[in-house]
Amino acid sequence: MLGGTGFVGPFIVKQLLELGCEVTVFHRGRREPELTAGAEHVHGEFARLQEHLPALTRRALDVVVDVNPGLAKSGHGVLHFAGIARRGVVLTSMDVYRAMSVLWGVDAGPPQQMPVTEESELRSQPSPDLGSNLDFDNLDVERAVAARSDELAVTVLRCPVIYGPLDTQRRLQRYVRAMADARPAILLDSRLARLRLTRGYVENVAHAVVTAVADDRSAGRTYNAGEHDALSEAEWLRAVGAAFGWNGDVVVADQTALPAKLRVPLPDQDLVADTSRIRHELGYAELVSRPEGLGRAIEWELAQQRDEPGPDYSSEDAALLGLH
């Protein structure tokens, strides 16, 4: 595995080890998650991956997995193993679809039909949120591995919005904090409240990766990974509340009635994925139910918040007062 000590990677390693696989993780050595205990660790800078190939290829390789192919590894990571490994697996994202460009507001439309399948139109614009810490757009990754498919058969897994323990983006932070603070209501911008996104609990996304690793039928195929149903943001917030045991209200309001920090200017575009291909071709099914996954995600998020200062709710209180 290239990478594997961040968010999704440790769960992939853990599940592969549980299957009895021999796992080598190449990473920068900044952290050694407990979940990866039992794997061989090789430390090095990704930009110098070629120098570490002898250490990584001491034993025969079946599959090489790049958890974060957006990071340059003397080029595209898995392609260094052409002629060495039998197959490759890369994790990209559903941001490759044109629908995401429409949602970002960099494509004037028209709104794209939902759900997207693996054959849906891809975006033509570069990602507007490509961070300075990334070298390749997900589209770059997919095109690069496709161009050399005769040398290495690579499975592409297009990941959803992922939630759960170890989430570096803290996607549940605002909601869980408000619930922990016993807020009577949580405000949502009306457009955000309607937005439907395909999500996936981290252990389930890891299981999708492991399913592809373990099944040769995945070679050269592209799969959407994620939950079979896509909740709106308002439905999602209520699901988080149910898992938390919060009895407050979800208050949906036009953005003109909201404080600036809660206004979310979004076009009328969802991003809902059809995940039937990986289910039908590889027999994928979730390991963890949504309520159970949310419970684990909430428990982890609460632990992160333990020593953090509380937010200022004054602008939200004023908005709630104005709505009554």
Model-found features: residue ranges?
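Mid/C-terminal beta-alpha module of Rossmann-like enzyme folds, strongest
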Residues: A208-D270, T275, E308-H324
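Conserved Rossmann-fold NAD(P)-dependent oxidoreductase catalytic core, especially the SDR/UDP-sugar
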Residues: H76-L139, A147, T155
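NAD(P)H-binding glycine-rich loop region in Rossmannoid oxidoreductase-like domains
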Residues: T5, R30-V90, V96-A99
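A conserved pocket-lining segment of Rossmann-fold NAD(P)-dependent short-chain dehydrogenase/reductase
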Residues: A178-G200
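Non-catalytic, hydrophobic alpha-helical segments
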Residues: V8, V205, V209, A225, ...
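Conserved beta-loop-beta element that borders a ligand/cofactor-binding pocket
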Residues: V141-L166
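N-terminal Rossmann NAD(P)H-binding glycine-rich loop of SDR-like oxidoreductase domains
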Residues: M1-L19
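Glycine-rich Rossmann NAD(P)(H)-binding loop
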Residues: L2, G164, L188-L195, Y223-A230, ...
